[in-house]
């Protein structure tokens, strides 16, 4: 992220977050279609809900709660969510070797790193200093399991993809709330 106006930094971060959230949703759907029998999907989704460690972060759970937090807090939460996936995503491409959506999985890590840098640039602008994000939580998700012949591995990966999708949705929401708060525009209704 080169030096640019704050409005551009926010616009770029929101676009990156939206793109990553869409990739995560597409990846989740493709994995589900390929590996999870239709009759099992709903019950598995309910069981997976409790396994996202990001639920332990005292972060807002929706747009209304996010609007009650400061921009710096929302940036910190977003950064923690993004950083918790950097490790696991390095293994994503090994799991999905012959798949169309997953053909982009090598780039997902780079896109996540770009978003991390964008959030850090926003934090520097808003905090007038270097980011201190590690103070909230320095936990990360397990890596994806490459053994797709094991039911346990399939369920683990399905749960991880579900958490990845949820976490990117949160980060996207936080960034959009901040952008709308600072730069009122027609695209603020979401």
From Swiss-Prot:
Cystine crosslinks: 52-163, 180-188
Matches recorded under CDD domains: somatotropin_like (cd10285)
Cellular component, GO, one term: extracellular space
Residue numbers of Phosphoserine PTMs: 105
Keywords assigned by UniProt, alphabetized: Disulfide bond, Hormone, Metal-binding, Phosphoprotein, Secreted, Zinc
Subcellular location: Secreted
Physiological role: Plays an important role in growth control. Its major role in stimulating body growth is to stimulate the liver and other tissues to secrete IGF1. It stimulates both the differentiation and proliferation of myoblasts. It also stimulates amino acid uptake and protein synthesis in muscle and other tissues.
Name of the protein in question: Somatotropin
Biological source species: Vulpes vulpes
């Amino acid at each position: 992220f080169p030096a640019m106006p704050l409005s551009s930094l926010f616009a770029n971060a929101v676009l990156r977050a939206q793109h990553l959230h869409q990739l995560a949703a597409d990846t989740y759907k493709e994995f589900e279609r390929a590996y999870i029998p239709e009759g099992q999907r709903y019950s598995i989704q309910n069981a997976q809900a409790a396994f996202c460690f990001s639920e332990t972060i005292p972060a807002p759970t929706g747009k209304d709660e996010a609007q009650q937090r400061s921009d710096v807090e929302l940036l910190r939460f977003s950064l923690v969510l993004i950083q918790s996936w950097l490790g696991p995503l390095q293994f994503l491409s090994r799991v999905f070797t012959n798949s169309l959506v997953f053909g982009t999985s090598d780039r997902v890590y780079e896109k996540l790193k770009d978003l991390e840098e964008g959030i850090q640039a926003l934090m520097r602008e808003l905090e007038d200093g270097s980011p201190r994000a590690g103070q909230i939580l320095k936990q990360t998700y397990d890596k994806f399991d490459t053994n797709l012949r094991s039911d346990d591995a399939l369920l683990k990966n399905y749960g991880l993809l579900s958490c990845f999708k949820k976490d990117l949705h949160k980060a996207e929401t936080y960034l959009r709330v901040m952008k709308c708060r600072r730069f009122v525009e027609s695209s603020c209704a979401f």
